[in-house]
């Protein structure tokens, strides 16, 4: 465990943080390949860098330049301000491995949004690209085309900001700004879109940076930045109006009274963390665009527990928080092999604005300490437990000490009061758990 990194980032109890990559130039979003191989030289994930590069990272954590100089204008590194836009959204087409990326470009002195599809022969270097959609007005100061995702229906969903200058366009059905767009992979309009011959899936958004699909309800969730308040999370449904510019709370399931710079989000839904975190939502709060030190505004990752139908938040906890003194902030997040990964846009560069110092960090569960026997808290093990619905299941699966299987009298479990023999447990022999707890005698018998 790297003590220096833990001085910079506080993490939720039971987890650790590791720096996987450093020296990236303003890394924004990251996306993992669908089924990574075990070969060191094969691609594991891709990362967009704000000022026009895409990096491919292989299983051995070497960094390769997949594409570079995709912007046709010179960015100015102004944070906050006109340096906040560029190349942001990233999505991998699972069958072909092609990348969809969103960015702004300059044409006749005006900034516009475009969506590109890039192709590669080996996954390490782009060999061709095509424009899927373009000509959507934008500016250099954020509120551009942001995250891209592919739904369970195989369609492409694209977050488009309102362009900042005229927020009323978010309500204009003839303008693609301030919308979530739905399209076929070639950019054409699906026949079953809410409005015939229109790419608009939902409207009323301001600066919808992040997007993720939840398996349990097969719905799209987005993160949308408010003006100086009401940064929100919303479950996006076909044909709905999400209120902006009149309100950021319309059809939202969560909003923050103060602006937190909400960016990316992802659900824990593939057993990257212990089962107790299943279906929880993890949201990056970036904070100020170049804010030094911990601050009270953002610079953390929040975990939220949603209700089953995605209409409300049942719990809210800080999961990761920056505690250093520089401008580091979490930006993109994604679950991948063995944990949650996030990009740190600025890193620890202490005011050197042009220095490539961005990082990728990994948060993983501390499953086992030396000398400790642990029963992994997975859905499979929980389903095999001798006491379905046991109130001590979390303790049984998480806190294994001295060969004891049970939670040692911390609740009113009747089996514990009697002394629960691990030999009776259907998973006990698998993990060599042989102890029993005899509460009456107050001693352990092996």
What do the PLM-derived regions correspond to, one by one?
Residues 111-150:
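Asp-box/WD-like beta-propeller blade repeats and closely related beta-sheet repeat scaffolds
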Residues 2-11, 36-40, 48, 74-80, ...:
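Beta-propeller domain segments
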Residues 40-70:
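Beta-propeller domains
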Residues 67-71, 131-137, 318-323:
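Short loop/turn motifs that cap or connect beta-strands within the blades
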Residues 19-52:
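Beta-strand-rich domains and repeat architectures in extracellular enzymes and scaffolds
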Residues 369-446:
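Cysteine-centered metal-binding/redox modules
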Residues 16-18, 61-64, 127-130, 156, ...:
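Predominantly a core beta-strand signature of beta-propeller blades
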């Amino acid at each position: 465990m790297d003590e220096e990194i833990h001085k910079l980032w506080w993490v939720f109890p039971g987890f650790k943080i590791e720096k996987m990559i450093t020296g990236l130039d303003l890394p924004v979003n990251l996306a993992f390949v669908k089924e990574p191989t075990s070969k060191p030289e094969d691609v594991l994930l891709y990362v967009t860098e704000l000022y026009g590069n895409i990096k491919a990272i292989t299983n051995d954590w070497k960094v390769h330049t997949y594409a570079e100089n995709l912007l046709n204008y010179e960015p100015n590194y102004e944070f906050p301000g006109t340096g906040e836009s560029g190349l942001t959204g990233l999505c991998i087409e699972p069958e072909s491995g092609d990348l969809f990326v969103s960015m702004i470009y300059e044409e006749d002195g005006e900034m516009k949004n475009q969506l590109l599809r890039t192709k590669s022969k080996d996954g390490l270097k782009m060999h061709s690209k095509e424009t899927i959609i373009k000509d959507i007005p934008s500016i250099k100061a954020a509120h551009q085309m942001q995250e891209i995702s592919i739904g369970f229906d195989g369609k492409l969903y694209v977050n488009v900001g309102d362009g900042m200058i005229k927020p009323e366009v978010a309500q204009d059905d003839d303008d693609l700004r301030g919308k979530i767009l739905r399209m076929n992979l070639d950019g054409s309009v699906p026949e079953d879109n809410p409005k015939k011959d229109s790419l608009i899936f939902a409207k009323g958004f301001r600066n919808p940076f992040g997007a993720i699909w939840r398996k349990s309800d097969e719905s799209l969730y987005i993160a949308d930045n408010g003006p100086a308040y009401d940064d929100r999370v919303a479950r996006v449904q076909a044909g709905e109006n999400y209120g902006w510019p009149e309100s950021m709370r319309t059809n939202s399931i969560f909003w923050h009274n103060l602006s937190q710079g909400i960016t990316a989000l992802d659900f824990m839904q593939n057993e990257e963390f212990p089962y107790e975190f299943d279906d929880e939502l993890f949201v990056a709060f970036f904070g100020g665009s170049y804010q030094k030190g911990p601050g009270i505004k953002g610079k953390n990752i929040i975990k939220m527990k949603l209700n089953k139908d995605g209409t409300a938040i049942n719990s809210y906890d800080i999961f990761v928080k920056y505690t250093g003194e520089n401008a580091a902030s979490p930006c993109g997040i994604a679950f991948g092999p063995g944990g949650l990964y996030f990009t740190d846009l600025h890193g620890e560069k202490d005011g050197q604005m042009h220095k490539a110092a961005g990082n990728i960090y990994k948060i993983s569960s501390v499953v086992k300490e030396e000398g400790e026997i642990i029963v992994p808290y997975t859905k499979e093990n929980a389903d095999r437990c001798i006491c379905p619905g046991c109130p001590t299941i979390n303790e049984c699966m998480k806190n294994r000490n001295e060969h004891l299987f049970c939670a040692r009298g911390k609740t009113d479990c009747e089996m514990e009061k009697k002394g629960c023999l691990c030999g009776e447990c259907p998973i006990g022999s698998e993990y060599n758990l042989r102890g029993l707890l005899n509460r009456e005698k107050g001693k352990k018998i092996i």
